Amino acid sequence: QYDAKGVGLGPGPMGLMGPRGPPGATGPPGSPGFQGPPGEPGEPGQTGPAGSRGPAGPPGKAGEDGHPGKPGRPGERGVVGPQGARGFPGTPGLPGFKGIRGHNGLDGLKGQPGAPGVKGEPGAPGENGTPGQIGARGLPGERGRVGGPGPAGARGSDGSVGPVGPAGPIGSAGPPGFPGAPGPKGEIGPVGNPGPSGPAGPRGEAGLPGVSGPVGPPGNPGANGLAGAKGAAGLPGVAGAPGLPGPRGIPGPVGAAGATGARGIVGEPGPAGSKGESGSKGEPGSAGPQGPPGPSGEEGKRGPNGEAGSAGPAGPPGLRGGPGSRGLPGADGRAGVMGPPGSRGASGPAGVRGPSGDSGRPGEPGVMGPRGLPGSPGNVGPAGKEGPAGLPGIDGRPGPIGPAGARGEPGNIGFPGPKGPAGDPGKNGDKGHAGLAGPRGAPGPDGNNGAQGPPGLQGVQGGKGEQGPAGPPGFQGLPGPSGTAGEAGKPGERGIPGEFGLPGPAGPRGERGPPGQSGAAGPTGPIGSRGPSGPPGPDGNKGEPGVVGAPGTAGPSGPVGLPGERGAAGIPGGKGEKGETGLRGDTGNTGRDGARGAPGAVGAPGPAGATGDRGEAGPAGSAGPAGPRGSPGERGEVGPAGPNGFAGPAGAAGQAGAKGERGTKGPKGENGPVGPTGPVGAAGPAGPNGPPGPAGSRGDGGPPGATGFPGAAGRTGPPGPAGITGPPGPPGAAGKEGLRGPRGDQGPVGRTGETGASGPPGFAGEKGSSGEPGTAGPPGAPGPQGILGPPGILGLPGSRGERGLPGVAGAVGEPGPLGIAGPPGARGPPGAVGSPGVNGAPGEAGRDGNPGSDGPPGRDGLPGHKGERGYPGNAGPVGTAGAPGPQGPLGPAGKHGNRGEPGPAGSVGPVGAVGPRGPSGPQGARGDKGEAGDKGPRGLPGFKGHNGLQGLPGLAGQHGDQGSPGSVGPAGPRGPAGPSGPVGKDGRPGHAGAVGPAGVRGSQGSQGPSGPPGPPGPPGPPGPSGGGYDFGYDGDFYRA
């Protein structure tokens, strides 16, 4: 046994390898040799047949409903136009025709929709189901014969290796020596058949919802959706007290004076008594034709004021009293009380997203053929050629590790087996016990990366947290009062027209203001009997809404009629269907990201292979175009961080996806053992920002329809991406301006595309042989592969000697200085971003998360010009909502592709330095439109205001928890191999670096010289079993 403490002056020259001793009993499986640098990704193998899917775990508990988002601020109440002053009472002279009731004043502009309530945080996703058990790792294939390491010459004080004597009999195992330098990697035994997948473990409980990240900047507000159909008009609210009648528009010419109502009984024309005082001549509502001045009888007693000319026919509808300045908003006819937006029903628990099918669990790599049981370390033969590894015996104490044999060429990475069909999401079976890792075959030369093995099972996606109830839609601005009892509200367009709200009862007519003084009536001829009131003059055309005349001075308002009682609030119309939201251009179909399955548990990272010399970083592939912004999926639970993949240079930032709702943070995956820190890869240059997508043009505003009673506002779905706003249509006749519906909830910002679970940490530099960690679990699914930057130069991992039995972990040697990382290879153009994998079936649409906090409401667009208020025409037919302008093309926010099947996990390269994060791309298009709330009846669209200025984007939300990795894009071209750095001393295992996107695999650098074997460490405890499977095929190394 070595004196581990001997001060070696350095390894003596390596003794000649003696003849291969008889196969010693296999030592415990050596730690798997470092995986050779991953070959360039081969075509993704098809995933092997999906292992049998474990039974589906029980659905995670549905996340609790997220807290209901705060209700968005109610939009400001549209400005209620001042209620037009009640026109002067018509001269009571001949009572003018009873004025036609002017149209209800225009409703004030719709208040801005309240900001959508903050979306409640998504309920916690159901806990990740326990990952189904990874099928038991098949018995490790036999470990290639590990030659018995020749005894290392005794480490002389000068460390010179004495001649290797013949291997004496193995003495009783001394304390485990430090693991010797890894011997050549034995050949990987044949891959055993894949063991059956264990049953999926029960689905874990949904992790608590991650904290919502700050709300991302609100995406650009989507074009205003067409106003949702206004909910059915609630029953008209009680007509608010009749707003003061708008200033009586200038009385149009008095309609032909109807026959003057019987003016109070005109006294018989007495002798033309003194002409009654000529009242001031009211504006002659053309006081009906003065009767021929009869003898000016007394101006008959001014009969009771004729009805206030029933407000005269409102003279011809006076100029539409400037829109009676929208009478005080009648109590919004309580906008039918918007039934409280039903809280967005808690989105039913997103059914627990059934466990996402394990992305069909990548068919488990066939179970590595049984790794033979680790034999006890064979007798240490002379460190002659390594004798064939004896059959693995039971782990004996590691015999002294002989000098590391040359590292065999890394076997080619086998192709991943075909991806099997995704099994139904089973419960993740419990992690099977890691089979004994068979000796890792020597890494073959870097093959091209085989197709990345299937990503680790994506954990069952936690159930999407229930969408918190949507905050109630901002209150719809109060409907302007129904002016005097409005004519029956025109049916809101297209909503289901609520039934016309019952016209609120007209408020009692204000008492007739004292009739304006009658103009001096010429001597009133005998007042002819009041002819039948002429029909109210036809409503003048609804002029362009005249400029709202300044409200005439209000004649003394007749006492305001008592406000009609507020009609019962109309029953809130059922939430009318939300008027169609203008056609929101199609949002790119990003289906809502299916709930992110919880990233499957990342298998424990396999032991970090020795970090080979860093190959030169290959040029980073060019950044692929940012895919269209996916709709914000819910933020999937953060999967456990997989081992760090190579940090590629930061890819060009794609356009930022819409901020997804913050998914609940998935449970933190178990930390894999920290692999030794690999050399820091050069940071790749940040990718360029993707160009912002063009703003869509604004669609034409349709002519405003008549305002129906505002139904309860349906939930506005999140605004779709702004369509191109078409040029505003000519203002329609000003319908009453419907109240501005509340701004729909701001759709959740699409979730930042889930960052895939971090890829497995790159191989840390070779740790002095450490005890053999258990087999590495399958690397977590790599995060979406960033544009692969060049991986740090991956040196060939020095040959890893056979892993001694895991001795007790020897003290970690000082980390050797990192080899000088070769300069990062020029960043190759980022490899094309892989096409998004086939979209997996969209996960259940996550329920809308709680509405994100409202971004500040965009400033209201300038209100469309109010048309001049025309005389109130008869309510014109409800204008059809103008067709929404064509939705402009979404800017290229790429959609998040549906989460492709996670690409096969790339081999873990050394952890490159995390490249700087590329600047965030422009905010991607807003995620998919949330489910439209119930359409309220569609209010007639008011003039379409210009789109308000886009609200400032809210803070960008934190990245959603890492979602399952997107498909790994094709690896960028492999950079040239960098020079091998000097072999560093065994570093202490560094913390796993942040997982960068897997970089393009650099070419394998030359293998650095093997460092001298370190003294064998005490056997380390077996590492956690990972789910990785090493398969060798004839030495080719395939790591699933």
UniProtKB/Swiss-Prot annotation:
Regions of compositional bias (Gly residues) in chain numbering? 318-327, 459-468, 696-705
Residue spans with biased composition (Basic and acidic residues)? 62-76, 659-668, 926-937
Coiled-coil ranges per the record? none
UniProt PTM comment: Prolines at the third position of the tripeptide repeating unit (G-X-Y) are hydroxylated in some or all of the chains.
Per the record, the domain of life is Eukaryota
Q: Which residues carry this modification: 5-hydroxylysine?
A: K98
Residue ranges under compositional bias (Low complexity)? 43-61, 154-175, 251-289, 340-356, 391-410, 434-458, 514-532, 544-560, 590-631, 640-658, 671-686, 706-716, 784-842, 872-884, 902-922, 991-1009
GO CC terms of this entry: collagen type I trimer; extracellular space
UniProt main location, coarse? secreted
**Residues that bear 4-hydroxyproline:** 176, 182, 284, 293, 410, 473, 479, 491, 497, 503, 599, 605, 704, 710, 728, 731, 761, 806, 815, 824, 902
Residue positions of the PTM Pyrrolidone carboxylic acid?
Q1
Q: In which tissues is it expressed?
A: Forms the fibrils of tendon, ligaments and bones. In bones, the fibrils are mineralized with calcium hydroxyapatite.
Listed Pro residues bias regions: 20-31, 1010-1024
Kindly list the places in or outside the cell where this protein is found, as annotated in its UniProt entry.
Secreted, Extracellular space, Extracellular matrix
Pfam families recorded: Collagen (PF01391)
Q: Which residue stretches belong to region Disordered?
A: 1-228, 244-1040
Q: Which UniProt keywords apply?
A: Collagen, Extinct organism protein, Extracellular matrix, Glycoprotein, Hydroxylation, Pyrrolidone carboxylic acid, Repeat, Secreted
Q: Which residues are glycosylated?
A: K98
Task: Briefly state the protein's biological role.
Answer: Type I collagen is a member of group I collagen (fibrillar forming collagen).
User: How does this protein assemble?
Assistant: Trimers of one alpha 2(I) and two alpha 1(I) chains. Interacts (via C-terminus) with TMEM131 (via PapD-L domain); the interaction is direct and is involved in assembly and TRAPPIII ER-to-Golgi transport complex-dependent secretion of collagen.
Concerning its family, UniProt says: Belongs to the fibrillar collagen family.
Q: What's the protein here called?
A: Collagen alpha-2(I) chain
